[in-house]
Amino acid sequence: MAGSSFTLPSTGSAPLDMMLIDDSDLLQLGLQQVFSKRYTETPQSRYKLTRRASPDVSSGEGNVHALAFIYVNAETLQMIKNARSLTEANGVKDLVAIDVPPFRNDFSRALLLQVINLLGNNRNADDDLSHFIAVALPNSARSKILTTAPFEGSLSENFRGFPITREGNVACEVLAYGNNLMPKACSDSFPTVDLLYDYGKFFESCAADGRIGYFPEGVTKPKVAIIGAGFSGLVAASELLHAGVDDVTVYEASDRLGGKLWSHGFKSAPNVIAEMGAMRFPRSESCLFFYLKKHGLDSVGLFPNPGSVDTALFYRGRQYIWKAGEEPPELFRRVHHGWRAFLQDGYLHDGVMLASPLAIVDALNLGHLQQAHGFWQSWLTYFERESFSSGIEKMFLGNHPPGGEQWNSLDDLDLFKALGIGSGGFGPVFESGFIEILRLVVNGYEDNVRLSYEGISELPHRIASQVINGRSIRERTIHVQVEQIDREEDKINIKIKGGKVEVYDRVLVTSGFANIEMRHLLTSSNAFFHADVSHAIGNSHMTGASKLFLLTNEKFWLQHHLPSCILTTGVAKAVYCLDYDPRDPSGKGLVLISYTWEDDSHKLLAVPDKRERFASLQRDIGRAFPDFAKHLTPADGNYDDNIVQHDWLTDPHAGGAFKLNRRGNDVYSERLFFQPFDVMHPADDKGLYLAGCSCSFTGGWVHGAIQTACNATCAIIYGSGHLQELIHWRHLKEGNPLAHAWKRYRYQA
């Protein structure tokens, strides 16, 4: 059956130019009047044009007409205005009219793009949706229905699309045209999807007072121990001291501060930084960038992720070059296009539209939090039991792959593993949960990624150097291993190496899971945690990761015009050329020769000697890219000082690089994240609270470390003094996480 034809009305009923209307309420009223005047003849037949749906209205002649909207860019709109019919509008492709009006303020551009792409026959981009054309067409015209998963609290919503084709034989009248007034997201930061609460905004709201809470006169201030001087522990110490706690002691088993915020400096090149831990910092990490700005460390540059810079791909014995900002080589384009289509179009699961990742990002960005909750819950419902591998197979090997092109099972999956989703090959983490990887995308952690020119460890160093109440946090830190933590009545005993015991009122633990379970012995009884929290600690998956850096005499990739990123299926996996001093192109260079995860990292543990490992990696890169590998020699021939490596799995203080949930394990993150909230229930509150990125929904990201530090700090302030609830709230800053009305998800254990 043919679609609707497209003809402009006669001169007497020319479409109304609404280009000057920039208010959604006025646009709604204007469109209502235009449609009502044209298609209703009696007052009784008038209708109200709502924001949620476009009406069907009788013309009084037995015909029922629907109001729908075509979305186009400015150029296409002008071509259609100049033509008397679609056939005269050269270059205009087949269009689709949908029943989503341009004044809907709960409908983002990304969601509109998804609906149009799924209802139409063409692929559109965001720039194609800047203008609308309002059309009336018979309700009997051929159409397609798209059903969404839960939307804005309702069970579902249906969208209707009418194909507008050159061959159509159903009249379609243009009524008006104008600017699309649907909101367009533009912020760099937004709440993370599992929380729907912006910790960055909370810290901003506290900036004027310089504290997140305080202790009223007459309230006994607690004696507090913080186990671990990673970033979470240092943030908590700083916030507690600023809130007025006088007695804070930080215990750190290693000889340095900062945990996984660890920047190695080279003696011969002090401006060159090897980030042994966290090295990629997305702009969406609002908490991190709040602290960077607060401490004068906002000098950042773009991280050279694959495709953002010239990239070499070595796959099955052949070398491919991927120019910066362009499409990847032809061999990889099917999987690249499929993934990009998934980001825009989401997935049709058994006929139900699951919101695209970009639509979820827009909902978060625009503050449509109920909508974001519904979108994310739908993905949890349908995909939480999937690994990333099985989820990708389900989508792209099935009958309705995003983008419309089905993948070949083995070859395309291998290509996708090598190419990754933005930050390099994801093959080693394919058995992680699908939701866990999707979480990275939705939280914006794969986009707009930065590096810190000063080195990220400068941030914990500056926090630790703050002098509060006459002493710095560094001076309050004891470098010793905590061996055991136990409870005695309403006090908590900390036993350190050597047998000494200190007694505290409140304890914040930021240690890794292995230390919590095997050294501190916190899960061996129910003295501190409910059984489900202990289970989460014992069963959360920590990812192994290895890095090896090389300081070179020159930035050879600039001088010889070589790719600054290499992805290989060999041992090295991912190679990055890093420039921490771009103002000096003749200065020393830094190459992250190998960054590996999981099984790829485990292989390297067989070669612990860094010189031997370097030689192996250099040979591997030489097979893939000999012109690059020949420049891989340490500056000044100094192998001892100018090659550095670290294996996070064998680090006794870490027990892994970061938490990465397996399928079905997202409930562990929920249990760990909300553990400090027990303080609001006196019968459950044991005075010990968890923090650290591994206790968040975003393991491995600084954002999660700060969020959990904030939770624990608020819990300590709230729980001190045994006051009435009303008083508790008075000495915590308004809008704090304990007072927030959390909208929890249904995670499936």
From Swiss-Prot:
Its EC number is 1.13.12.3. Pathway: Plant hormone metabolism; auxin biosynthesis. FMN binds at residues 232, 252, 260, 280. GO terms for biological process: amino acid catabolic process; auxin biosynthetic process. Keywords: Auxin biosynthesis, Flavoprotein, FMN, Monooxygenase, Oxidoreductase, Plasmid. It comes from the Bacteria. Substrate binds at residue 280. It catalyses: L-tryptophan + O2 = indole-3-acetamide + CO2 + H2O. Binds 1 FMN per subunit. Gene3D superfamilies: 1.10.405.40, 3.90.660.10, FAD/NAD(P)-binding domain. This is Tryptophan 2-monooxygenase. It comes from Rhizobium rhizogenes (Agrobacterium rhizogenes).
